[in-house]
Amino acid sequence: MNNKKTATNRKGMIPNRLNKFSIRKYSVGTASILVGTTLIFGLSGHEAKAAEHTNGELNQSKNETTAPSENKTTKKVDSRQLKDNTQTATADQPKVTMSDSATVKETSSNMQSPQNATANQSTTKTSNVTTNDKSSTTYSNETDKSNLTQAKDVSTTPKTTTIKPRTLNRMAVNTVAAPQQGTNVNDKVHFSNIDIAIDKGHVNQTTGKTEFWATSSDVLKLKANYTIDDSVKEGDTFTFKYGQYFRPGSVRLPSQTQNLYNAQGNIIAKGIYDSTTNTTTYTFTNYVDQYTNVRGSFEQVAFAKRKNATTDKTAYKMEVTLGNDTYSEEIIVDYGNKKAQPLISSTNYINNEDLSRNMTAYVNQPKNTYTKQTFVTNLTGYKFNPNAKNFKIYEVTDQNQFVDSFTPDTSKLKDVTDQFDVIYSNDNKTATVDLMKGQTSSNKQYIIQQVAYPDNSSTDNGKIDYTLDTDKTKYSWSNSYSNVNGSSTANGDQKKYNLGDYVWEDTNKDGKQDANEKGIKGVYVILKDSNGKELDRTTTDENGKYQFTGLSNGTYSVEFSTPAGYTPTTANVGTDDAVDSDGLTTTGVIKDADNMTLDSGFYKTPKYSLGDYVWYDSNKDGKQDSTEKGIKGVKVTLQNEKGEVIGTTETDENGKYRFDNLDSGKYKVIFEKPAGLTQTGTNTTEDDKDADGGEVDVTITDHDDFTLDNGYYEEETSDSDSDSDSDSDSDSDSDSDSDSDSDSDSDSDSDSDSDSDSDSDSDSDSDSDSDSDSDSDSDSDSDSDSDSDSDSDSDSDSDSDSDSDSDSDSDSDSDSDSDSDSDSDSDSDSDSDSDSDSDSDSDSDSDSDSDSDSDSDNDSDSDSDSDSDSDSDSDSDSDSDSDSDSDSDSDSDSDSDSDSDSDSDSDSDSDSDSDSDSDSDSDNDSDSDSDSDSDAGKHTPAKPMSTVKDQHKTAKALPETGSENNNSNNGTLFGGLFAALGSLLLFGRRKKQNK
C-alpha cells in the first residue's frame, strides 16, 4: 500500500492526525460523489366363325329374310381383377379364331300351288376359318423364373444338371422322349366370374326372351377369370368339362388343339380336346416355371351340341366345369327348321381339319305326293369327291327323324343311297339325283347328306345351291358363308410334318456335334410362324431332343433359351447343317418333308477367379518386398459392371483374398482401408507387385487375374501441444514520513536538515521458449513450470536527539543507508526425442512475483534556545532492487513409436523489505535561529507515485480561508516571528528555571 506519509505544502491539507489542530486556520470543505445481454383360348387349329347363309325360295313369294351379320367379339374383364392388378399390363390376346357359327339367310313359302321354284343355297369357302376367340391373360407382379442365365453371387455353387449319355447313332434317330407326365392340378387353378352369354342373340317378339339362333350367326361365349398357384409346374394338367348340351367351337367343330395364351401370345398351357368325352385337357408349358403369380381371363367361342340339343324353341342347360368350378345357365335354342318347307338345308358342321362343309338337306317334310322329284346340288367354290362315297341318301320312316338341329341319328334311318344314281358333272361341282327312280308317283321323304370340299381355284366366297324340281313346282335353297376373319385355304387332307432335333453340350467348343457329346435336358424351345407368332413351345428331354409335330409346309422360326451355366457355341461351323449349331435363333423350312436339322450347341461357361494380396508397406515404396507381411481382416468388395455387389470377403492371416466362379466380364474390386493405416503409392512398378489403390477396375477375358493388390502403411500423424505461461508480478511499496517540528526561542540559531531518499527498483524478466518438431505418429509431452517470487525487505531506523543550551553547538548527523538486491534467475531447458506413436505436449509456466516494500520514517524535532547553534542532519537512503529472470526453453522432437514426457519446474522467491525511520530532536535556547527544511524524495521507476500524490493533494487540501497576497503573507510572517521570539523567551525562562 502506498501509505507513505509526506509533508504537504503549507497551504495544502495537513495529514489527518494533524487536522484537529488546524481547524482554526483552514475551512473544511465537504464533497458529495454520486456513483453513479420428409387366357386366348385359342381354339387354335385356326378355327373360325363362319357365317352361314341359307336361302329357300318359291318363285312367287318370300316370307322371311335374315340378313347375314358380321360376327363380332367382345372382351369382358372382371373389374375386380383389374383393381387387384393395377401394376400389370393387360393386352388383347392374339386372335386365334374359329369360323364355327353360321349366319343363315333363308327365304321360304308355305304356298302349295304347283309352281316352278328355285332353291339357292350357297356356301362361302373359308380357309383356316376362325371364330373371334380371344383370351386376355393378366399377370401381376410376375417374377421371371426362367432358366435364362441370371446374375448370381459368385460364392454360390452353380446348379448341376445330370445328363444321360445319348446313343452314338443319334443322328439316325428322330424320336423324342414321351411328354412329361404331370399331376392334375384342378385344385390349383381357380376360376371366377364364369359366364355363358349369347353373342348377339335374337329376341322372341312373343315371349320377349333372348334366344340362341344357331343358323343365324349367333354364337355362345364362355367367359371366366382365373389364377394359377405358384406351385404348378410344367407338365401339370387341368381340365374343362363341357356338359351334355354345350361344346367348344361354333358351326365349325372344335380343333383338337386348344391352347391357352398370355397377353403377348406366349403359350401358357397346351390343350387337347376329346370329342368323345367333350373334355379339354390342358398341360402347362414351361411358362409356369418362368413366372409366378399368373392370373388372367379368357373368352371362348362355344356352341350348342346339336346331337343333344335338337329341338327348336327349347331351353337347354348349358353347363361347364372349369377345373373344379362348375357353372350352368339355361339357353333357348332355335335352328330355324321349317317343317312345311319341301326343301330346306343347313350346314351340320364344318370339319376343322379340311374345312369341308357337311351338309344336311330335308326333302319333302310335308310328305307331299309327287310324280317328279329331281334333286340337284350346284357348288360354287367347292367340289364333290366321288371317290369318298360321302353322298348319302336316307329314307325317312318316322317324321320325328327330321330333327330341328339337322343332325339326325342316321343309325335309325334307312340308307337307300345304292338305289339311286348320283350323276356328277361340271368338274364335280354339280350332282344330280332322280328321286323317282322309275316310280310314277311318290310321297317318300328323304334326308340327304353331302360333303363339299373347298376348291382352291375359287376366288369368290363360294356357296351351295339346292333345287327340288317337282311336277308341282321347283323349290330352291341356298347356303352361303361369309368369312368373318379370313385366312388361307387347305386343299384336301394336307399332310403334316415335323420339325426339331437336338440341343447338345459342345464340350470341345468346336461348334459341331461329336459322338461322345451329350444332349442337354430342360432347354426351352419356342416355335413361331413366319410372322413371329408363337405356335408352340416345348422343353428338351433327357437326351436333349425336342420336336414340333403337325406342321404344314412353310417357314418357321425356332428359338432356344440359354440354359443356366452355359454359353452358346459357335454357330454354322462347316458345311454339314445336320451336325452344326444353328445358334439361339434359327429358321427352318418345311417343304413336303420333316426338317430335323435345327440344332443348338452350348458349352459350360468357364468360371474364373481374381484376387491376390493386401500387404503392409513398411518402407512406403508402393511395392511388395519379400520382408513385408500381409494384413489380415481387410474387407474386399466385388462389384459387377452395373455396380451391383456380387461378393465380399476378408483377407486371411497372410493378407490373401480371392473371388471364384466368375464369368468373363468387367468388375470392380474395392478395398476398405483398415483403421490407422494409410494408402501407399499406387501403380509404381510391374502389375503383380505394385499397389493398385482402393478401387480397381478389372476385365476378365478367359483367364484368372491374381494381380489385384493393395498396400498400406501406418498413418503419419503428429500431435504437438505447447503451452507457455509467463506471469510476472512486481509490487513495489515505498512510504516515507517526514515530520519536522521546530520551536525557536530568541537569539537562537537552529539548523535541521532531514533528507529522506527511497529508491525501489523491481525488475522481473520471464522468457519462455518452446520449440516442438514432431514426425509421424509421435506424441511428446513436455511440461515446464517456472515460478519466480522476489521479496525484498529493508528496515532502517534512525533516531537522533539533540539538546542544546545557550551558547552551545549541537551537531547531529544520522545517515541510514539500506541497499537490498534480490536477483533470481531460473533457467529451464527440456529436450525430448521420441519415436513414433507419441504425443508431444509442452506446457511452460513462468511465474515471477517481486514484492518490494520500503518504509522510511523521518522525524526531526528541533528546540533551540538563545544563543545556540543546533545543526541536525538526517539522511535516510533506502534502495531496493529486485531482479527476477526466468528463462524456460523446451524443445521437443518426436519420431515414430516414442513417448516422451518432460516436466520442468522452476521456482524463485525473492523478498525485499526496506524500512527507514529517522528521528532527530534538537533543542536550542534563546537567541537562536531556527530553520527547518524537510525534503522527502521517492524514486520508483516501476510505478511512479508522484502523480497520484499530487492528485490527492489537490483533492484533499482544505481551502484557504485567508488572503493569498504577498502583503498578508508578510504580515503573517512577521507576526509569526514575533510570536516565536516570545515563545522562545518564555521557553528559555522555563528551561532555566527547571535547570
From Swiss-Prot:
Subunit text: Homodimerizes; via N2-Domain. Interacts with host NRXN1; this interaction mediates bacterial attachment to host cells.
Gene that this sequence comes from: sdrC
Biased composition (Low complexity): 960-975
Pfam families: Big_8, Gram_pos_anchor, SdrD_B, SdrG_C_C, YSIRK_signal
Biological role stated in the UniProt entry: Cell surface-associated calcium-binding protein which plays an important role in adhesion and pathogenesis. Mediates interactions with components of the extracellular matrix such as host NRXN1 to promote bacterial adhesion.
Protein name: Serine-aspartate repeat-containing protein C
Propeptide positions: 962-995
GO BP annotations, alphabetical order: cell adhesion
Record's compositionally biased regions (Basic and acidic residues): 72-83
